[in-house]
């Protein structure tokens, strides 16, 4: 299993104060020196709430690890990434809403202009992945557009798992739609969410599409996903950075790697 470390929220801390620390390159080399991280993931958002264009340039110039850049189909961002001298190892196209706190679901593959953006990256020799819900239609769209990777949105699975097996439902930011559900109902929905991820991962495998997954994964809910044999990569960020605040980034990375690289 490949471990993609998302370091967006290292930069979130920097941007809150509009200062120079924490240094994104230091985080990069801490990750590299653990010898457990396979790639670095960053999300270049339209509103630049964390990662900035300059961060992209610096990372691509010196990173010893592959860089996966998440982004929308925004024209300015597409043009910027296509113009880069140092190319990312892949671009993962994600949906984006300026009012969202974080990505809320998978990409709508009927989105106008999506095919053109995929072709623009392919023409520059940049591999494309699509951040999608685990659905057949998304896989067929990927196949039709010569996209060799998808990343399944695991938010539904992760939220249900957290509601059942953590104190998430007792916290200030509990998800209202899950808070009042009984454990039996949550277990059934969680089981169905897992089965859907497993079914669509198998489907993708037989279609020749590499399957990655991410969103909302943490030290507890990630374990079940390791039972999906066709899953090749997990991208995890917020939970690792959250733990790093308390125990340090190196230890937080190693603890996650111990779970997913068994």
Curated annotation (Swiss-Prot):
Location of the protein in the cell: Cytoplasm
Pathway field: Cofactor biosynthesis; pyridoxine 5'-phosphate biosynthesis; pyridoxine 5'-phosphate from D-erythrose 4-phosphate: step 5/5
Site (Transition state stabilizer): 151
Keyword Cytoplasm among record annotations: yes
Binding sites annotated in the UniProt record for 3-amino-2-oxopropyl phosphate: 6, 17, 216, 237-238
GO MF annotations in UniProt: pyridoxine 5'-phosphate synthase activity
SUPFAM superfamilies associated with the record: Pyridoxine 5'-phosphate synthase
Domain of life: Bacteria
Leading EC class: transferase
GO biological process, one term: pyridoxine biosynthetic process
InterPro entries assigned to the protein according to its UniProt record, in alphabetical order: Aldolase_TIM (IPR013785), PyrdxlP_synth_PdxJ (IPR004569), Pyridoxine-5'_phos_synth (IPR036130)
GO cellular component, one term: cytosol
Keyword annotations: Cytoplasm, Pyridoxine biosynthesis, Transferase
Main location (coarse class): cytoplasm
Chemical reaction(s) catalysed: 3-amino-2-oxopropyl phosphate + 1-deoxy-D-xylulose 5-phosphate = pyridoxine 5'-phosphate + phosphate + 2 H2O + H(+)
EC number(s) on file: 2.6.99.2
Residues binding 1-deoxy-D-xylulose 5-phosphate: 8-9, 45, 50, 102
Annotated active site: 43 (proton acceptor), 70 (proton acceptor), 215 (proton donor)
Family (UniProt): Belongs to the PNP synthase family.
Subunit structure: Homooctamer; tetramer of dimers.
Family matches, as PANTHER family: PYRIDOXINE 5'-PHOSPHATE SYNTHASE
HAMAP family: PdxJ
Function as written in the Swiss-Prot or TrEMBL entry: Catalyzes the complicated ring closure reaction between the two acyclic compounds 1-deoxy-D-xylulose-5-phosphate (DXP) and 3-amino-2-oxopropyl phosphate (1-amino-acetone-3-phosphate or AAP) to form pyridoxine 5'-phosphate (PNP) and inorganic phosphate.
Designated name of the protein: Pyridoxine 5'-phosphate synthase
Organism encoding this protein: Helicobacter pylori (strain HPAG1)
Gene encoding the protein: pdxJ
């Amino acid at each position: 299993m490949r471990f993609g470390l998302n370091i967006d929220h290292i930069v979130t801390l920097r941007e809150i104060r509009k200062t120079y620390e924490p240094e994104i390159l230091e985080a990069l080399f801490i990750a590299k020196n653990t010898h457990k991280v396979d790639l670095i993931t960053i999300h270049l958002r339209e509103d630049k709430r964390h990662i900035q264009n300059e961060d992209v340039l610096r990372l691509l110039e010196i990173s010893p690890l592959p860089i996966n850049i998440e982004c929308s189909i925004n024209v300015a961002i597409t043009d910027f990434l296509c113009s880069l001298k140092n190319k990312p190892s892949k671009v993962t196209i994600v949906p984006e809403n300026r009012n969202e706190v974080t990505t809320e679901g998978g990409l709508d593959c009927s989105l106008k202009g999506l095919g053109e953006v995929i072709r623009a990256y392919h023409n520059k020799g940049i591999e494309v992945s699509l951040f999608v819900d685990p659905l057949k239609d998304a896989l067929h769209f990927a196949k039709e557009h010569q996209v060799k990777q998808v990343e399944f949105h695991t938010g539904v699975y992760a939220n249900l798992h957290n509601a059942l097996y953590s104190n998430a439902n007792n916290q200030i930011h509990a998800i209202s739609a899950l808070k009042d559900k009984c454990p039996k109902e949550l277990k059934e929905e969680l089981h169905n969410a897992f089965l859907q991820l497993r079914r669509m991962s198998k489907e993708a495998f037989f279609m020749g599409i590499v399957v990655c997954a991410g969103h909302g994964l943490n030290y507890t809910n990630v374990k079940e996903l390791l039972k999906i044999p066709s899953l090749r990569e997990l991208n995890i960020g917020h939970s690792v950075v959250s733990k790093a605040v308390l125990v340090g980034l190196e230890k937080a990375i190693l603890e996650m790697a111990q779970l997913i690289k068994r």
